[in-house]
Amino acid sequence: RNYFKLDTIVFATGYDAMTGTLINLNITGENSLNLKDYWNEGPKTYLGLQIAGFPNMFTITGPGSPSVLTNMPTAIEQHVEWITNCISFMIKNDFKKITTSEKDSVEWGKQVKEAADKTLLPTVKHSWYLGANIPNKPRVFMPYAGGLPTYTKICENITNNNYKGFLFS
């Protein structure tokens, strides 16, 4: 028998990164759309900030954001500042609802894939970045790999173009 003196034992038993927490909340959007059903082929978001069919629901460090591939506090700060400014814009313009479209979410997903394909990250087939640690989870590279500075510029351009890709009412 071997004995090891330890101060701490950390059991890393796996987790459903980026989507698990949201899916487990059993969120229902417009027309009784269930988030788990909507993401059955993989997560779709616009900028990792919003999900088509789920108005007024913002996500922070969600799939499609740079989150886990950058300094998390910095990514969270960028997301929160952007969302705060967006809500201020809504209040100033008397908007009660914000959503995005399926089309813009799909287009953003293509940009996420293009950024990832410039790296080796998607080639690691057993990575949690792809959801490979969860049985039957669709294999989709979830974080935006273009870097936080590029992502921030994209968000700024969208804001400066009247929140292109977002629909207000």
Describe the predicted segments one by one.
Residues 45, 58-169:
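C-terminal, flexible cofactor-proximal segment of oxidoreductases
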Residues 4-16:
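Short hydrophobic core segments
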Residues 5-7, 38-39, 140-143:
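Short amphipathic beta-strand/extended segments with alternating polar/hydrophobic composition
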